[in-house]
Amino acid sequence: MLEFYGKRFESRLLLGTAQYPSPSILADAVRASLSRIVTVSLRRESGEARAGQDFWALIKALGVAVLPNTAGCHTPREAITTAHMAREVFGTNWIKLEVIGDTDTLQPDPFGLVEAARILCDESFEVFPYMNDDLIVAERLIEAGCKVLMPWGAPIGSGRGLNNPYALKTMRAHFPDIPLVVDAGIGVPSHAAAAMELGFDAVLINTAVAKAGDPAAMARAFALAVEAGRLAYEADPIEARDMASPSTPLLGKAFL
């Protein structure tokens, strides 16, 4: 069972709530995904606006846990301010910390991320840092107090899947006891299954579901892929080989 900061969840699929064609389609996708955690952007879903109130009512009706994020923040100060606002609006210490360093690739700023994470952890936030796949950055985030890491698979919204599976596999081996979530870049369910087969604890999907022709159907496909990938990992799959290995026994074969 998935566990973040002492809270346990049956589903290993986290779902973003941005870019859906309508609130009803979002609700259908969340239900189809079986996800128990959704991410929310405070900047987009202001609790003071009527639209924000309607959105918040929809999320509460779904009965899912909310993971607010600091999307769009480019400095530690900006991210910290947004995190405090999110805690007040959504009533949770959870925060998906994003400090963006490059506007073209939306690559996280590792230096600003670690700085903001250290301050927020000291202020009793439970931080989910969106990061690259660098082991040293991961070490610094853990030292800062993060108990979950969210390395990217590929740039946000790119749909490229896992750009560097070797780095992700290395991170899994290096941090066997830290919950790891592949965040960003997942395009199709097979990408999610591949991440889970590497031993990751969960994946976060947004654009691939929200922008699909049928978001609810795609959400269901991702739910099945995540489950299949996890089962495959737990089943201890065979290692890839460079040469063939016969699978049919020779017993009973006629020799001339």
From Swiss-Prot:
It catalyses: [ThiS sulfur-carrier protein]-C-terminal-Gly-aminoethanethioate + 2-iminoacetate + 1-deoxy-D-xylulose 5-phosphate = [ThiS sulfur-carrier protein]-C-terminal Gly-Gly + 2-[(2R,5Z)-2-carboxy-4-methylthiazol-5(2H)-ylidene]ethyl phosphate + 2 H2O + H(+). 1-deoxy-D-xylulose 5-phosphate binds at residues 157, 184-185, 206-207. GO terms for cellular component: cytoplasm. The keyword Transferase applies. Its EC number is 2.8.1.10. It is an enzyme of class 2 (transferase). One of its GO terms (biological process) is thiamine diphosphate biosynthetic process. It is found in: Cytoplasm. The active site is at residue 96. Pfam families: ThiG. The keyword Glycosyltransferase does not apply. Disulfide bonds: none annotated. GO terms for molecular function: thiazole synthase activity. Pathway: Cofactor biosynthesis; thiamine diphosphate biosynthesis. Keywords: Cytoplasm, Schiff base, Thiamine biosynthesis, Transferase. HAMAP family: ThiG. Homotetramer. Forms heterodimers with either ThiH or ThiS. Belongs to the ThiG family. Catalyzes the rearrangement of 1-deoxy-D-xylulose 5-phosphate (DXP) to produce the thiazole phosphate moiety of thiamine. Sulfur is provided by the thiocarboxylate moiety of the carrier protein ThiS. In vitro, sulfur can be provided by H(2)S. This is Thiazole synthase. It comes from Brucella canis (strain ATCC 23365 / NCTC 10854 / RM-666).
